[in-house]
């Protein structure tokens, strides 16, 4: 898309065509951010957001076996796990030593780093300064002077809402659109997914995961058909590493309580996150019955103590 004219209810496409609408759903996703560093245009310096980019990455690792991943967030670490299975040498570079520490806390951050190290991933704490090479990338140099050889680099350095074509609607500082509980931006425009900042427990929230976008889509569809069903659903997504699926319920920008029940190293645990006595998020592995019950209870705004009881009651049944 080239430009949205919300006053005239028109969309101008890149090929020059114009579309008119009565109601519009914006689900444009996000655009990977590329650090503005020397060598960023070298062949082999890749991002991952689309199926086409995934196909390029898979095809490239068939003959290039020294991968450096810049960033240790979900996409970066999921790729690390997937490509270690193919015997690719993987080095992860990040200024933040522990993967997912911001989302899951320090203890689970240490666990994920340890698990990836056990599978052969190398971690380097630092920031990239430049990518070296003639036509193709051959190394990454860091700000502290370290040099890491690489035949392929994945930039897992975050994304930005794909809203550059929007000029006549108010955008937030991060480029997203603010929506209400029905995903409405204005009288005839709705937005979902990566570009939508939505209310969650009274707090403006934006979550970058396709599963949450699916939840948003159902809510927006009802509202666009004049059958609004405000979004009270608990955000839910998962991340998978070395055959283990880790489920995340809710959303915790901060918490003042955390309890891990079970053992992450044994791939069976529940981590509860509480704020002011309320349950705000859950991370779990191989506790599907427990997470199913907690997902329902979180929608009813149950407390942290109630969640502890639920985990205890369901633990024996799942052992």
Q: What is each stretch, according to the model?
A:
Residues 28-86, 123:
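Glycine-rich dinucleotide-binding loop and its adjacent helix/turn
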Residues 66, 88-91, 188:
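Residues at the starts of beta-strands that form the adenosine-phosphate
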Residues 41-64, 135-141, 147-215, 219:
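FAD-site-proximal beta/loop scaffold in flavoenzymes
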């Amino acid at each position: 898309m080239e430009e949205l004219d919300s006053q005239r209810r028109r969309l101008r496409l890149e090929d020059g065509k114009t579309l008119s609408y009565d109601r519009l759903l914006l689900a444009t996703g996000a655009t990977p951010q590329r650090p503005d560093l020397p060598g960023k245009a070298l062949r082999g310096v890749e991002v991952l957001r689309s199926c086409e980019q995934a196909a390029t990455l898979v095809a490239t690792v068939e003959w290039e076996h020294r991968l450096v991943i810049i960033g240790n967030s979900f996409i970066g670490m999921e790729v690390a796990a997937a490509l270690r299975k193919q015997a690719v040498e993987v080095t992860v570079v990040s200024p933040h030593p522990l993967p997912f520490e911001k989302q899951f806390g320090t203890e689970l951050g240490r666990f994920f780093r340890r698990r990836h190290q056990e599978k052969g991933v190398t971690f380097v704490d630092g920031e990239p300064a430049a990518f070296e090479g003639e036509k193709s990338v051959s190394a990454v140099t860091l700000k502290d002077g370290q040099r890491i050889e690489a035949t392929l680099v994945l930039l897992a350095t975050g994304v930005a809402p794909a809203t550059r074509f929007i000029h006549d609607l108010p955008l937030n500082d991060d480029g997203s659109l603010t929506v209400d509980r029905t995903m409405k931006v204005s009288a005839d425009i709705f937005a979902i997914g990566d570009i939508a900042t939505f209310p969650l427990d009274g707090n403006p929230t934006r979550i970058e995961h396709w599963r949450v976008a699916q939840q948003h889509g159902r809510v927006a569809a009802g509202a666009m058909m004049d059958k609004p069903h405000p979004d009270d659903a608990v955000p839910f997504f998962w991340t998978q590493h070395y055959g283990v699926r880790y489920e995340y319920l809710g959303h915790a920008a901060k918490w003042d309580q955390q309890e891990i029940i079970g053992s992450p190293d044994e791939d069976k645990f529940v981590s509860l996150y509480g704020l002011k006595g309320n349950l705000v998020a859950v991370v779990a592995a191989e506790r599907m019955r427990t997470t199913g019950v907690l997902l329902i209870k979180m929608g009813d705004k149950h407390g942290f103590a109630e969640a502890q009881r639920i985990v205890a009651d369901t633990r024996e049944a799942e052992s």
